[in-house]
């Protein structure tokens, strides 16, 4: 580049063809324009070219030079500046190439025209060939596929407005991309549906006859109540009292016993009231059935949990949160209270930038630190939407090479571990979660009958067909088969009726 007051470099550019201000016979001008040195005679000859070269070389050695690898920047079409010599700036240029087309070289004192690369910029400078942005504006981004300019060893500069992402092993940073993620669907395949041709008064009469006189026709009760939806059973209750002036629930209690009675009475409660009584039973007396609390609060919908709070307060004159606080403690208590709010995000959209942030925070709260920040797991697992968390679990697996469940097992223990695992399993695959619970209820010596009854009744109109399929897939035997082998009598009959068939 030529500047006024400096002699032209050796091998300078010959005049470009054509006329005009910057070419033709008038270029270069016969004399330099006045620049304030008019009184200095022969000023151009006063500068020693060797001195200039030596000064530049000295500066290059002092400040580290600016050695640029050859071919780092592509040349402009039709020619352009020659590559920087290996010795750094200030060295005599090599032989110049052929004359480029008109307009490629800048005017004296100017910059290269748009589209012609210049020397490597400083970090944060505009991409070569692009103008400086106006004050207050961010410089434009690099060309597609080109990394932002940085100092050696410096991490790439994030786009304007985006925070730099922390570095985690095996986890590349990503922008705020929001791809379309299909929403996770809840199961809606129950074994019990509304009976066709339903007549509540006729069913009330059938039940009356089954309990009248000496003995009880348990099979008639099983056939009637085991094939009606909960909504229809509530109508039977009303019709029974209307027709006979008696409470059907009291009659059933007086005629039935054992686990068969418990199953029939569970069928007669509304789903909300049934859960309220199950929670009450889980926390009353000595000891707490933590697994019951976890199962109910981790698997129910927001609407169900909000209605459960109302029903609990009505039935037992204290809030569900007060009941939880009185019988649990620590991080497990906080988990249950968070779940009992029924306030999980229910959107189906997934923002992958938020997914990546949650993955990083979970990793930093557990695997990437000494100890565990349980509150961070609680905040993410209890508030984010189902679709969002499924994406988080998949991304966590990709980043760490470890399933989120394995990380929870490594970082937590006791009731908190079981609670967090239940939340994750329900979000991943609710039918598989209940299939595992059913298998554990019947595994080994003895049967956890309350768990067996609760799951069979509460899921009978939601996803019991899906639970059956998962059970067969996970354990190689049908749910029907295992119930048959682990129960007996009328209790077995009503459970098999609810199960709806063998797989």
Swiss-Prot record:
Assigned keywords, A-Z: Acetylation, Annexin, Calcium, Calcium/phospholipid-binding, Cell cycle, Cell division, Cytoplasm, Cytoskeleton, Nucleus, Repeat
UniProt keyword Acetylation present: yes
Primary location: cytoplasm
GO cellular component: a single term: spindle
Entry-linked SMART domains: ANX
Keyword Calcium attached: yes
Pro residues composition bias: residue spans: 1-17, 80-145, 155-169
Family stated for the protein in its record: Belongs to the annexin family.
Function summary: Required for midbody formation and completion of the terminal phase of cytokinesis. Binds specifically to calcyclin in a calcium-dependent manner.
Free-text note regarding domains: A pair of annexin repeats may form one binding site for calcium and phospholipid.
Protein name in UniProt: Annexin A11
Source organism phylogeny: Eukaryota, Metazoa, Chordata, Craniata, Vertebrata
Gene: ANXA11
């Amino acid at each position: 580049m030529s500047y006024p007051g400096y002699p032209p470099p050796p091998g300078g550019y010959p005049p470009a063809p054509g006329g005009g201000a910057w070419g033709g016979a008038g270029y270069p001008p016969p004399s330099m324009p006045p620049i304030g040195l008019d009184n200095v005679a022969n000023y151009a000859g006063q500068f020693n070219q060797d001195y200039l070269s030596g000064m530049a070389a000295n500066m290059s050695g002092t400040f580290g030079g600016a050695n640029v690898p050859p071919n780092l920047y592509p040349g402009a079409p039709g020619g352009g500046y020659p590559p920087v010599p290996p010795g750094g700036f200030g060295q005599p240029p090599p032989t110049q190439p052929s004359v480029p087309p008109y307009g490629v070289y800048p005017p004296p004192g100017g910059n290269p025209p748009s589209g012609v690369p210049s020397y490597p910029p400083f970090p944060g400078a505009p991409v070569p060939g692009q103008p400086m942005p106006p004050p207050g504006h961010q410089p434009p981004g690099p060309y597609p596929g080109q990394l932002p300019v940085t100092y050696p060893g410096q991490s790439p500069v994030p786009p304007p407005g985006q925070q730099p992402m922390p570095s985690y092993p095996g986890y590349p940073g990503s922008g705020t991309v929001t791809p379309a993620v299909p929403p996770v669907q809840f199961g809606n395949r129950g074994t019990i549906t509304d009976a066709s041709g339903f007549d509540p008064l006729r069913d009330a009469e059938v039940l009356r006859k089954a309990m009248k006189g000496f003995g009880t026709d348990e099979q008639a009760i099983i056939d009637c109540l085991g094939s009606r939806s909960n909504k229809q059973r509530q109508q039977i209750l009303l019709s029974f009292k209307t027709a006979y002036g008696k409470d059907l629930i009291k009659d059933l209690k007086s005629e039935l016993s054992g686990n068969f009675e418990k199953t029939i009475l569970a069928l007669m409660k509304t789903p909300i009231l049934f859960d309220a009584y199950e929670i009450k039973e889980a926390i009353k007396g000595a000891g707490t059935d933590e697994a019951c609390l976890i199962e109910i609060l981790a698997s129910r919908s927001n609407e169900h949990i909000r209605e459960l709070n109302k029903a609990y307060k009505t039935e037992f004159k204290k809030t569900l949160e007060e009941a939880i606080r009185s019988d649990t403690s620590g991080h497990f208590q906080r988990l249950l209270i968070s779940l009992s709010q029924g306030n999980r995000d229910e959107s189906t959209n997934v923002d992958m930038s938020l997914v990546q942030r949650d993955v990083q925070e979970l990793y930093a709260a557990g695997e990437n630190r000494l100890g565990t920040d349980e509150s961070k797991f609680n905040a993410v697992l209890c508030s984010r939407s189902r679709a969002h968390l499924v994406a988080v679990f998949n991304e966590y697996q990709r980043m760490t090479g470890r399933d989120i469940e394995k990380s929870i097992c490594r970082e937590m223990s006791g009731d908190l571990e079981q609670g967090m695992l239940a939340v994750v399993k329900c979000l991943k695959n609710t039918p598989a979660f209940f299939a595992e619970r059913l298998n554990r209820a019947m595994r080994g010596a003895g049967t956890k009958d309350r768990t067996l009854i609760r799951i069979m009744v509460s899921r009978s109109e939601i996803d019991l067909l899906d639970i059956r399929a998962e059970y067969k897939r996970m354990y190689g035997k049908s749910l029907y088969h295992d119930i048959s082998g682990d129960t007996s009598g009328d209790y077995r009959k009503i459970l098999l009726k609810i199960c709806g068939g063998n797989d």
